[in-house]
């Protein structure tokens, strides 16, 4: 899985000088932009201009260009030839496609995790579940979203299916983005606790039902989040128009 820690921190050698090479600069920039898109700092449709990003992140345009290519491959960025890139705007069709894939992928991952998990993996899943609950209670929205995504990633690891893990890595950014649309963090944490319990008891039938319900919750959360943002935009527009007419 991708590191969602503090991506702006640069590595240094023993003498205190920077040891970042071209490759590590590209990785760092990619992580910064990926997190900012998933966390909602850079909104859908916003411009990603190489020159501006290079200045902002203190690098040349080469790692910016490579990072944008990588993020386009992950489905987070729309590259436009001979002009700037933009943060991808997921259409209803895009969301429907992702939900169809997740319906198969998530349920299979949870079922296999319930069947094949080991003690070490289960302990890792429990720790991540507990962390997500704590972050939710503390009101750490970004942290709770990242922890929720980590929970799903660990479940895929526990499936013991290498191909599922590879597919999970391919879908990782899209799924993290979708999970970041959840506003009811406590409800998500509660469902994760129920899923963990079913996995721990190797109850495949129960975990299948819970996973299907969890997917339904995810879709509902996304729809509510979209409605809330649209309402906020409308209210902001009305407020500006009212101020201009005064």
Where are these regions (language model features)?
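Short linear motifs at protein or domain termini
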Residues: 1-111, 115, 219, 223-246
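C-terminal all-alpha effector/ligand-binding and dimerization domain
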Residues: 2, 126-133, 138, 177-246
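Short helix-capping and inter-helix turn/linker motifs at the boundaries of alpha-helical repeat units
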Residues: 24, 122-123, 185-186
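Solvent-exposed, non-membrane alpha-helical residues enriched in polar/charged side chains
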Residues: 34, 38-39, 54, 133, ...
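Acidic/polar helix N-cap motif
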Residues: 91, 118, 140, 202-203
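Hydrophobic packing residues in well-ordered alpha-helices of helical domains and bundles
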Residues: 98, 125, 144, 148, ...
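Hydrophobic, amphipathic alpha-helical faces that serve as interaction scaffolds
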Residues: 101-114, 147-184, 221
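Amphipathic alpha-helical dimerization/coiled-coil segments
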Residues: 108-133
């Amino acid at each position: 899985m991708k590191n969602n820690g503090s991506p702006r921190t640069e590595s240094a050698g023993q003498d205190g000088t920077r040891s970042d090479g071209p490759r590590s600069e590209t990785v760092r920039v990619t992580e910064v932009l990926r997190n900012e898109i998933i966390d909602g700092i850079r909104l859908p449709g916003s411009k990603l201009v190489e020159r501006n990003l290079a200045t902002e992140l203190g690098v040349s345009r080469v790692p910016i260009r490579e990072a944008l290519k990588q993020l386009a491959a992950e489905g987070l960025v729309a590259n436009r030839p001979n002009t700037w890139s933009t943060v991808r705007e997921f259409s209803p069709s895009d969301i429907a496609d992702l939900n169809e894939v997740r319906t198969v992928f998530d349920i299979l991952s949870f079922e296999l995790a319930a069947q094949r998990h080991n003690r070490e993996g289960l302990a890792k899943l429990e720790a991540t579940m507990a962390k997500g609950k704590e972050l939710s209670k503390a009101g750490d929205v970004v942290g709770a979203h990242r922890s929720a995504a980590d929970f799903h990633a660990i479940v895929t690891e526990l499936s013991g299916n290498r191909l599922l893990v590879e597919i999970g890595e391919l879908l990782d950014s899209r799924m993290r983005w979708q999970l970041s649309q959840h506003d009811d963090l406590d409800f998500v944490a509660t469902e994760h606790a129920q899923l963990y319990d079913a996995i721990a008891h190797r109850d495949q039938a129960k975990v299948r039902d819970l996973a299907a319900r969890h997917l339904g919750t995810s879709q509902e959360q996304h729809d509510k989040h979209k409605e809330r943002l649209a309402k906020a935009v409308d209210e902001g527009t009305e407020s500006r128009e009212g101020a201009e007419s005064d």
